[in-house]
Amino acid sequence: MARFFQSAVKNTIIFSTALFSAFTFAQSKLAIVIDDIGYHPKEDAEVLAMPKEISVAIIPAAPYAKIRNQQAKAQNHDILIHMPMQPVSNIKIEEGGLTLGLSEAQVNERVKKAKSIVPNAIGMNNHMGSAATADATLMTYLMTALREQHLFFLDSRTIGKSVAGKIAKEQGVRVLDRHIFLDDSDNLADVQRQFQSAIQYARK
């Protein structure tokens, strides 16, 4: 989401505020999560100035992760840990992320460390993770750790064959799926169309 906000965040703030007003009236529910918080002070500040109904997902390895956790909490935003996870591609992920082959103890330790950096988090979603969320062993270890930390999991659905939701339910972890990416395109009109698609989905 950060790429889009660099060019269009002011317009998005107005648009999203109007959407939330409409949704309150219609008694429908739309959850919006803005990812990649913790790297860019200006963009982060613009996101945190948005209505409190918008959730923020903080990357624990980001340089401003701790202060963004405090600021988001002070402004009554729900907070998620945006946990880096191994993708199918060879893109390198941030330090402390989840990769294939980690032991259960290693996964547990990384989740605990992430929670210590973002202590006000109520859940976790995946940053990338197309390989990680399709791996049953890694997801089993992750859901065990999330259950111990009393965190839910939001599957960003970066791959169609994700097993995260299935394993979360088996492990007794609350799980949600991402349905629509708002910023597949950086064009404001495209993002607005995605918002409208999100509204229609929520009203089903």
Predicted region positions:
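Hydrophobic helical h-region of N-terminal Sec-dependent signal peptides
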Residues: 10-19
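N-terminal signal peptide c-region/cleavage motif recognized by signal peptidases
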Residues: 21-23
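Catalytic-site microenvironment of enzymes
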Residues: 4-5, 12-13, 26-204
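Basic/polar, cationic surfaces and motifs that engage anionic cell-wall
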Residues: 1
